[in-house]
UniProtKB/Swiss-Prot annotation:
This is 2-C-methyl-D-erythritol 2,4-cyclodiphosphate synthase. Binds 1 divalent metal cation per subunit. It holds the Pfam family YgbB. It is an enzyme of class 4 (lyase). It comes from Blochmanniella pennsylvanica (strain BPEN).
Length: 157
């Protein structure tokens, strides 16, 4: 059985948290506003994985009203969600992620991001595709007010 999941996340710049994408700290003059570490890649990926497995969403699994998730490393959340999903017999076929931001450029960090995901999901980096794009200065992302990420996953069981 094939199962497809789709995830989306967005965070506003302007907070005091460092910019973390895919578990990698990215130098940036603007911080992120968030309850956890604000890692849009991890958050959208968790939502995609949970969606494919029909296990709800990141907000119900890790509510921002629960203090134990304040400042938490989203890689830990990914590992917890993935353990729940694999206990149901799901296997990961592939991941396709698009990070949408005007600044900073992240292409030089993509290999590190893929490596983190492959470690956390116990899969090959060849099963993971990450790309970055801009909005050509349009909208809140184009004005460098925020960052967004879309993740699509294919699971089998």
């Amino acid at each position: 059985m094939l199962r497809i999941g789709y995830g989306f996340d967005v965070h506003q710049f302007g907070g005091c948290r460092p910019l973390t994408i895919g578990g990698v700290s990215i130098p940036c003059m603007k911080g992120i506003k968030a309850h956890s570490d604000g890692d849009v890649m991890m958050h959208s990926l968790i939502d995609a994985l949970l969606g494919a497995a029909c296990c709800g969403d990141i907000g119900s699994m890790f509510p921002d009203t629960d203090a134990k998730y304040n400042n938490i490393d989203s890689r830990k959340l990914l590992r917890i969600a993935w353990e729940k999903i694999t206990m149901q017999g799901f296997l990961l076929e592939n991941i396709d992620i698009t990070v949408i931001l005007q600044i900073p450029k992240i292409n030089t960090y993509i290999y590190q991001m893929k490596h983190h995901l492959s470690q956390d999901l116990n899969c090959s980096v060849t099963s993971i595709n990450i790309k970055a794009t801009t909005t050509d200065t349009l909208g809140y992302i184009g004005r460098s007010e925020g960052i967004a990420c879309i993740a699509v996953v294919l699971l089998t069981r």
